[in-house]
Amino acid sequence: MFSGIIEEVGTVESYDGETLVVRANQVLDDLEISESIMVAGACLTVTELSETDSTFTVETVPETRNRTNFGALEQGSKVNLERSLRYGDRVGGHIVQGHVDGVGTVRSVVEDGNSRVIVIEAPANIIESVVEKGFITVDGTSLTVVDRNKDSFSIAIIPYTFDHTTLNERPEGSKVNLEADVTAKYVANLIEPYIGKLQK
């Protein structure tokens, strides 16, 4: 479990479609093999650590590759990183599972005062769980939804978040990993069997 507060932006050292090696600094502190780490919004298991190279290694499976933008990763790509929460940790964002629901496309990035408003086009299965002023996870970052349309939603990014995440490298047309708020997904799943009955 994570909170969507990015600790560090790491750099991809190598990725062959299965084994992903990431160079980092801060998140390596007390990180252990077999622990979970969120990479660009996806919860992955650490399989190797290298103190000499300041890298960690994770493995991706077909389900991860099909659900994420990992197909575009290459040496030098930047990725948001967050270690898993421990009991007693402060949850600065919201409850994030690290289970990416799908990939969205940045439709526009517009400066608005000291913020940037980003509009993201998203698949229907994600849009139906997006709530205005609710939470959404974009490439692992916990963000608040400004508004929602039938096929897109917008988020407002403060300067600190823009400067300390990969959102500053996501121009129009970029693909981003999305995870809808888990609470919304559970509620939708619980009431779905009864919707048809209520409509009769």
Give the location of each predicted region:
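Conserved loop->alpha-helix
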Residues: 1-200
